[in-house]
């Protein structure tokens, strides 16, 4: 019986961990998952690339309507983009607020347009 209780507890913790991991992609109605994948003109792992990613994370995640901000580095040879940013907005109004926010506008003008060589922007809502 004790062994059954132990396994039950392990499976329960595993299910909770899986649920927490999947929760970040479980959009609610009206929420928007905003992602951008991009290239920088710097060698991977360079001080310049690291600075861009850290600055982008600090600046963009500091905008009040941004939720669940994450920065990513590409690991697959199937994709030509090196990096990614991802975030969630509660609704279209928050997404618009983000796009018009002075910190976002400044980051795009001062850093993005000068340092990003290529990008693809993706915005998703739940399909059903």
Which residues fall in each region the model found?
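C-terminal structural segments of small proteins and small subunits
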Residues: 95-100, 105-111
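Short S/T/G/P-rich N-terminal loop/turn motif that feeds into the first structured element of a domain
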Residues: 2-82, 90-97, 123-128
């Amino acid at each position: 019986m004790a062994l059954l209780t132990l396994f039950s507890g392990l499976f329960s913790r595993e299910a909770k961990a899986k649920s927490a991991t999947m929760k970040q992609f479980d959009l609610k109605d009206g929420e928007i998952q905003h992602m951008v994948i991009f290239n920088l003109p710097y060698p991977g792992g360079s001080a310049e690339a690291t600075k861009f990613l850290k600055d982008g994370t600090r600046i963009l995640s500091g905008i009040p309507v941004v939720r669940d901000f994450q920065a990513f580095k590409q690991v697959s040879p199937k994709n030509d983009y090196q990096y990614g940013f991802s975030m969630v907005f509660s609704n279209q109004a928050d997404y618009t607020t983000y796009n018009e926010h002075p910190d976002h506008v400044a980051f795009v003008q001062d850093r993005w347009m000068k340092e990003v060589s290529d990008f693809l922007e993706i915005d998703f809502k739940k399909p059903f």
